[in-house]
């Protein structure tokens, strides 16, 4: 079935160019030439250097945003960047708590370079602490098909084998994303038929290789811009919106038992981006395209966790999909302080409570569990301390916040 006509309307969600931007309209960012003020009752919220949006004034202090960059290779971050973190007082194990609350798992991302750190793996391997793992980089396109038709799975296999040996669920991440593409894909001058075949072959080969091992796949990652328009990448530019259907159908054919997700950030609050994704979900479901879940990445800032997160989870779940928190971290400006750590504890607790309160929210994954290997300092200058454990593997107050969120 052709979906392009239905999807085309979503692509028209463009910034408003007038004297003032209305609610959810763009109001700033590098290269923006439109209005920089908002209509009455709304304020201009800066999300990044590239995008600001008009939001209701009542939400101005509770909305957060982050534009996820390609994950750099993990590096060890020294303790000189932050003050002593304090320590958790909870003795509970987080995956045990999650399952007691009716969730499938509490999990973490990891990366291959970290697995040589025996102190790190001693904690990672505890399946009462983590019941699920996500490979941060080793299943992405540049890692698995660096040359056309030449696949390599050694990195992904290492993490898949770790999940199997520890009795953990494995999340596949990801099949189709605009970033971390090999140049033969991103710079390719393909016809629609050629790129369709390339997507089908990549998704089919990748998902087939891990058939029976993966609980859920992030099949399509980050298809929308923050203003709700479609990202203009090689996939969209060549195939329009149909690339989403092509990828999902290829993944379903390769592993009928794996849950198929679209994974996105900045959908944790109501706005143009969340609306576009919600409309996409409705269109896909109406056309019987296989889609089982929506991943809420949840890269937050201390003190700015959206108060409407639970409502957003519920809204998407009402479309007949499961939902999950897939990449949780809550960063702060360094150095950390007792006040920031206390707020971070509250923030983690509130995110967990939101998932715990929604039956269709199957679990929570942190985007690595220790500040030692967090992606944040390499991506956001002067920020860090985003994880529940500090760089010395000491549990922070945030750990207690997670336990509290699960009802402990």
UniProtKB/Swiss-Prot annotation:
Signal peptide extent: 1-19
Documented EC number(s): 3.2.1.8
Low complexity bias locations: 76-89
Stretch list, region Disordered: 64-89
A Pfam family annotated for this UniProt entry: CBM_1
Keyword Signal on entry: yes
Keywords: Carbohydrate metabolism, Disulfide bond, Glycosidase, Hydrolase, Polysaccharide degradation, Secreted, Signal, Xylan degradation
Catalytic activity from the UniProt record: Endohydrolysis of (1->4)-beta-D-xylosidic linkages in xylans
pH dependence: Optimum pH is 4.5.
Active site as annotated: 222 (proton donor), 327 (nucleophile)
A single GO cellular-component term on record: extracellular region
Pathway membership: Glycan degradation; xylan degradation
Residues of the CBM1 domain: 20-55
Membrane-crossing segments per the record: none
Domain GH10, first and last residues per copy: 88-405
Temperature note: Optimum temperature is 70 degrees Celsius.
Example GO BP: xylan catabolic process
Matching PROSITE patterns: CBM1_1, CBM1_2, GH10_1, GH10_2
A molecular function (GO) term: cellulose binding
PANTHER family: ENDO-1,4-BETA-XYLANASE, GLYCOSYL HYDROLASE
Record-stated family: Belongs to the glycosyl hydrolase 10 (cellulase F) family.
Protein function: Endo-1,4-beta-xylanase involved in the hydrolysis of xylan, a major structural heterogeneous polysaccharide found in plant biomass representing the second most abundant polysaccharide in the biosphere, after cellulose.
Full protein name: Endo-1,4-beta-xylanase A
Organism: Phanerodontia chrysosporium (White-rot fungus)
Encoding gene, per UniProt annotation: xynA
